Amino acid sequence: MQPAERSRVPRIDPYGFERPEDFDDAAYEKFFSSYLVTLTRRAIKWSRLLQGGGVPRSRTVKRYVRKGVPLEHRARVWMVLSGAQAQMDQNPGYYHQLLQGERNPRLEDAIRTDLNRTFPDNVKFRKTTDPCLQRTLYNVLLAYGHHNQGVGYCQGMNFIAGYLILITNNEEESFWLLDALVGRILPDYYSPAMLGLKTDQEVLGELVRAKLPAVGALMERLGVLWTLLVSRWFICLFVDILPVETVLRIWDCLFNEGSKIIFRVALTLIKQHQELILEATSVPDICDKFKQITKGSFVMECHTFMQKIFSEPGSLSMATVAKLRESCRARLLAQG
């Protein structure tokens, strides 16, 4: 592509992230020209839906969310569907009380250590930017550490809180959305033992064995632990793994439908690239394949990708997930 053509795609995306040097401008332009039409159509429908003031839980809303929440409505919709808005309304002033509470040097140091590692490719998080979102990120993570002392701060939460801040542009709303994720939607993912995270990685393994037996057999033959391949997918909720717009579309559904969405995404990535994965002959090889499957046009074209996650894995109810979690958790606890 000629330099003049390259400049048609801004080097910084709408969220403040610098596009990498190897960014495929041509593929992105082709995708976005059609996606823009979809976005415009969805924005009109959402504006109509929200005229009444509320965001009722209904089949219509579920369908709308799966087709994507427009950026201008995203914070409001996430807040309502996740229960974060209700929590914030019931606890006025609580967030600011947490920030003014007793100091915890260990917590503060742990958070500070990760600030510069959080989105170095995002201009909004650079110290040279005014205002710099690092301070906002620090406040949200500090308040959450005081609020949920059983978790405190865990690596991965910085990336999640960072995305929440970019979408809400509001500290307090970001705090309550983080609480919805860490406290309710993904319980025990970020606790010291990370039992919820370990359990869900095992659940994914069981789902792969049932739905994609050839991949399951390869994993067993090579003796690969799922944690080696997907721990960052789960703990970062695909942040810094999949393209920004795709992650946000996943989160639209995550806040509305819960954690089974993570399994749908993981299963779709694996199923779509099953042939590539089955070429692996060693542990390093399969690790490399799992990095490859999170790149390219399949994940960039977020609208098609989201349609796939609701068709490719087949039926996947919360009841099925709950049953698998129960057996996997029991197995992990028995192993000590």
From Swiss-Prot:
<dbReference type="InterPro" id="IPR035969">
    <property type="entry name" value="Rab-GAP_TBC_sf"/>
</dbReference>
<feature type="domain" description="Rab-GAP TBC">
    <location>
        <begin position="68"/>
        <end position="258"/>
    </location>
</feature>
<dbReference type="GO" id="GO:0005886">
    <property type="term" value="C:plasma membrane"/>
</dbReference>
<comment type="function">
    <text>May act as a GTPase-activating protein for Rab family protein(s).</text>
</comment>
<dbReference type="InterPro" id="IPR050302">
    <property type="entry name" value="Rab_GAP_TBC_domain"/>
</dbReference>
<dbReference type="InterPro" id="IPR000195">
    <property type="entry name" value="Rab-GAP-TBC_dom"/>
</dbReference>
<keyword id="KW-0343">GTPase activation</keyword>
<dbReference type="GO" id="GO:0005096">
    <property type="term" value="F:GTPase activator activity"/>
</dbReference>
<dbReference type="Pfam" id="PF00566">
    <property type="entry name" value="RabGAP-TBC"/>
</dbReference>
<protein>
    <recommendedName>
        <fullName>Growth hormone-regulated TBC protein 1</fullName>
    </recommendedName>
</protein>
<dbReference type="GO" id="GO:0005737">
    <property type="term" value="C:cytoplasm"/>
</dbReference>
